[in-house]
Structures are given as C-alpha cells and as structure tokens.
C-alpha cells in the first residue's frame, strides 16, 4: 500500500493524516513501513546556491509529531552536488545513501529511471525486506527514447465542458499521449470549449475545427455545453474526420446521428429534455423507480460482447472487453433498429444484449464511441486499444506511417467464471476508488 500525504508539513489540514501514518508504523511494525519525504531545494539567484534550510525545517516539524523520515528525495531544477547531499544527511539524521537527488526531468516518464539509477528501488526493498529481482527497464527506456526523439504532430480536438482547467481531462490527454508514443507521433491537443460552439454558425464551427486530424468528446454530466458537442460530432461525421466518444460522448453521438436519421431536431436525451419527442438516450425501465442516491448509476467494471468485424473487436483483439463505467443514462433500445438501418452499428453490447456499450458508423473511416471510460486503463507503454487505433486513424489521415497493433491477452472475467459474463446488467465488484472514478 502507498499512502501519499500532500501539502506542507505543519499545515493544519494535513495533521490528522500525518498522525494516521505515524500510528500506522506502531500498528504494523517498524520493518513494514517506510517514510519517504519529498522536499524542494530552492536556488538563490545571485549565487546559484541550493538552500537546504527548508528541508531541515520540514524534517524538524515531522520529528515534532513523531515521524522520522527514512528516505529524503530532494527536488531541484539544477544538479545537486555531493556536499549538499552530505549536508542534508547530517542535519536530518538520514543515511546519506537514503538522500536521493531528483533533478527536474524533461518528461515525467524519465523520473522512474532517475530514481532507479539513484538506488531508490534497492533501498526500499532492502528496508522493507521485500525479495525482488533486478528490474528489467528495457521497455521503459525505449519509451523514454521515443519521447526524446522528434516526432511529427497530430492535432486532436478535445471538445469538452471543462476545458478552462485541462487537468479535468488529464486521463484523456495522457491516454492520447500514450497512443501517440506507440505510433511515434506527438499528440497536440486543441482544447475546444463546447459552449462556445453553441453560439457559432456551421461555417464558424468548421473554421474552429479546421486542421485537426481527430475529434474526441469526453465524458461529463448535465446539459451545459451538450449542443456544442453535438455540433462538433456532426462536423466530424460529415467531414469524415476520425472520432472517439467517451461516456457522454457516445450519448451525444447517438443524439446527433438520430437527428439526421429521424429527420428531426427533437431527438435528445431525457436527461437534458424530459419532454423530447424522441428520447434516444433514456433511463432503462427498471431504473425509473430507483430513488436512492446513486442507485440509478452504473458504476464499476462491466463486460461487453464485441461484434465480429467491428473496429472495436479489431482494436481489442478479443470477443469480450471489460471497461469501467460511471453513468446513469443508456441508449434507448426502442430506437436501435431504426438507427441501425440508417447506418449506426451497435458493435458492442452487454452479454445479455440489453445495454449498448459501443457504437460505430458503417460508412465512416473511423467513428467509434463507448459508454465506458477506457482512458482510465491506458498506460505509457501499453496504450489503450481504442486510443491507439483512434490516434492511428488520425495519423493515417495526415499520411503518416503508423505502428501495428499489439494485443495483450484478452481480459478475463473479474469474477473468474463464464457466468459473470452473462450478467450484462450486474457489475463486477471493483475497489471503491475505481467505482467512484
């Protein structure tokens, strides 16, 4: 278990948490807890000297509440001299080999390599008496080499409600970066505030999106900005630009396509318009009587059965995919046949066929949306299959070479039995942190 306590030592907000980790060592034993303290070494501009006094004071404050750091990691923009490490070790009563320098890196993915070179991994395993083999960091080193190498840009528009604070979509933007590294390109994000598109004419929207190689609409809740997302999706569909929709992005894609297929602007979600004539997105009938808070929300890990020949089946390389969910409304099954006849392919559904999990457009080069949040499973050296293929399609649109797909072994049922795959509407049990993601 890793416990991270942020903030500054001495802040009143963090005192209960520091007391908790102090007691943790008493509860589980000295050799089962390791205190790692990360501090900043400020530099004096005139002399260029790195000052250790803030670190000394921080450790003094920790000692005052009963915590003696076992490891100190020193952050700095500049190289840290050996004499500075010795000084910190002397005045904090920490072994000099446990004072780890960590200079600011060009990429956060270089940090694990820096820490390994400094011996942090061996120190942790030795202090906690954990048997561990020498780590094979070949793949990670290759990843860092790709990051350092010059790469052509592929610009992706993220059309969202919360773009004023890009960290609101940090998992999405990082998943794009992971996929871009796989294809040896650089994902450049163009942040588009969906509300501003609602006030634009079609030609203005085209100008706002012109030049992007792909459009991504992430998740969200509430009506604000939804019509702007719908308009961006219409542009991607009509211009045949690669599109990826996540959670609300799928629902907006269904709304946009339904308006075209049904010949009406009144197709909508009952979340946004309870009086809509065509509620193509709606609560399932067995959800409408649930009144407990959160009771109608589908949370956690769910399986989906992927159709043969679909882009999602090709991406995952498996018949069953497991993804995490956090949503309340579903595609209204009443409209599935009519939308299917118009060209929408429900390419992934729950094992019992009741719930739509993935959609595609048959006549579009790459138009995929999922009701799930696949961005949460992407890793730097293992990009999520949907993001990988989305960025690949965007790069191909620019005439850039792309890397082949690398499929991992198909996901197994979290419950471990085929029966778990047949319960389309029942979630597999997931940790609380995943259920609330």
Question: Which positions does each model-derived feature cover?
Answer:
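N-terminal beta1-alpha1 cap of cysteine-dependent amidohydrolase-like domains
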Residues: 3-320, 325-363, 374-437
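Short FAD-binding loop at a beta-strand-to-alpha-helix junction that anchors the flavin cofactor
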Residues: 366-372
